[in-house]
Every structure is written in structure tokens, then in C-alpha cells.
Amino acid sequence: PACAVAIRTAMVAPAAADKYNPAVRRPTKGQEASYTPTNILVTGGAGFIASHVVIRLVKSYPQYKVVCLDKIDYCSSLHNLDEVANYPNYKFIKGNILSADLIKYVLDTEKIDTILHAAAQTHVDNSFGNSFAFTENNVLGTHVLLESAKSIGIRRFIHVSTDEVYGSSYQDEPSRREGDVLEPTNPYAATKAAAEAIARSYWFSFKMPVIVTRGNNVYGPHQYPEKVIPKFVRRLVKEQPCCIHGDGSNSRHFIYVGDVAAAFDTILHSGVDGEVYNIGCDDEHTNLEVARKLVRAVHPDRAEGDDLIEYVPDRPFNDVRYYIDSTKLHALGWKPVVSFEEGLAKTVEWYKKVSADWWDIGTDSALAAHPTPPAGVSNSLVQDVPSKL
């Protein structure tokens, strides 16, 4: 059975054969941290956030080799990486993190010392109808990667999680800090909480140098338009209304992707092993407020734009808001610099220019009020490994 095959392929050498020496530890809590990578593997690097991280690292640090591993799912695109495709310090490998043989091969042959793990299924709506695929990719995929990384003695492993693991926040509650209890409320968030729990266990059990990040809602160029901001922009360009879940009062903190790429740059070089870092901002807006701002941006001649707002049934469960404290990351020298208005303007401009074929499978299904993965998208446990890397 496929599941049995997946479990067999995920097995790696016994712990006794691991190259990682737990006696050699990087700075711990309260210590100065300064880290210089050599060869970086970015998983999910053709996706939204990770593609911006790849571009930043490739361009800013020509002395680093950046290897991007991505299976090119429906929401990823090699076009996201066009601007670095010909850089000598960049390499792309098509492959799936569920294949331990492939991961071990890449880590060995590319002499990887640093991993930024962003590969994941991330769309909450999809997790309500196909949660098993989220467990496969987000939990098992992370576990496969951690075991392979441990076996080669990885020097830094950054695990990308989400603020959704904290669960819903309410107006009278303080902001969530990194040590707070995790209370995920949807299958996507639950798999991300499980994945980061496994990642952190490798720090506690083996002193493997793991860092976890939890970010706010990110927006900007390259994002597949199943997510709220690009979906609304694409619909408005087509003269279709923004589809508001419920009454539109649910709020989110929206942070521009360029600021998030800068945060990962900071964490890569200055983060402390074993720590968790929230990546957040102060730009909180309800979904209805976002829709109205986008109506004005796309159709400035229709100031009210009520005909471009449509209310649809809410998700099975929709968190009221997420509110996180990023003080720990600020102490490393990072703060967001792009305002919501500036970020929205850049985002609208990009989506107006780019056609739907930026993504191989198109975007029609993504523009539905409650999108599901496009027909024909495979959720098989282990996909084919390319014969040539």
C-alpha cells in the first residue's frame, strides 16, 4: 500500500550513524548568535513566501549557494524564480520532501549545511475537505526532512510555521508570545502545530539546531490567488465582486512579503538555536476593510463599490483574529518597514500585470468563494523522483 511504501522510504540510518554531534552546540537562549551558512536548501522555494526568500539570498549573498527544492504544486510556479534563474549561486531541483532517498541525496551531493523549510500545504479552506493531504505534506514531510538533516549533521534548520497555531485571539486578550499554549482550530493549523512540535523535539532530544518561525498573514506578488488579497484583486479586475466570508468582521494582521523575506534573512544570520520567533506587524484589518481598500485601488471611480462586495457563507470555523508579539525578533534588529497602503499598491500593480498562466494550472478554480484544489492535482503520498537532478 502507498502508506507502507511511504513509511519505508522515510526510514534513514540509525541514530548511531548520525554525523550530528549533540555535544557541539550553538549559542543558546540569552547568548549572542552570529551564523554564516554556505549551502542553503530552501524547500517549497517556488512557492509564494519562499521564492522571495530565495531571491533575496541569491542576490544579496553571492558567496552562498542556494538550492531550491519544490515539487511544483498547483500554487507554486517556476516563474516566481525567473529573476534568479541564471545566477551561478542558484540551483533548482524538482522533488518531493516525502522522498527520504531524494532528500538525503540532495543534502549529500549539494553539501547542504542549512535548511529553510517552507514546503507545506497552506490553504485553510482546502484543509476542511482534504485534511489527510495536509498531514502527509506538513507533518510526515517535515519528519522526513528532520531525520535526513539530523543524519548529515545540519548546522541550522529553520522551520516555517504560522500564527494560526495559537488559535483565535479576542479583542480583550493580550498578544500571543512564543511561549504561549498552542490551540489550533482548523486542520491546517493543527498539522503546522504538529510539525513544529516534531521539529522542536529534535532540538530538545538531539540538540539539533532548530529554529521555528510563526508569521502573520503574508501578502504580495507571487501568491496564488486562493488567498484573500490576490483573490479579491483578480476578481475585481474581472469585474467580479469580492466574496466576503460571513459578515467580514474577522480580522487579520497583514504583513508584506518583502518584510517577511527580510525577517528570514535576520533569523538565518542572527537567530538563536532552539528559539521560536513571531514575525508580525501592527497592520490589522477586517476582511471587509481589505475588500473596500482593494475596490478603491482597482476601481478608483467607484468609491462606494457596494456592488463589488458579496457576502457568502462562512468557513466551518473562522478564527476571529490573530494577534502576536514580535518583540523577540525586534531585538535581533528586524522590524517591518512597508505600510499596508504601500504594500497593497505594489500587490495590485503586480496582479494587474501578470496573467493567470503565471501558474501552470491557471487560477479559475482559486477565484471561487470557497476554492478547492484544481482538478487533477495529485495528493499521492510519494510522487515520482526525477531521474536527473
At which residue positions do the language-model features occur?
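A short, amphipathic alpha-helix embedded in the catalytic core of nucleotide-handling enzymes
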Residues: 57, 202, 231-236, 263-267
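Proline-centered turn/helix-capping motifs that create local helix->coil transitions or kinks
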Residues: 158, 165-171, 207, 223, ...
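The catalytic Tyr-centered alpha-helix of NAD(P)H-dependent dehydrogenases
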Residues: 184-191, 215, 221, 225-229, ...
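N-terminal Rossmann-like NAD(P)+-binding domain of SDR-like oxidoreductases, especially those catalyzing
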Residues: 6-218, 336, 346, 353-364, ...
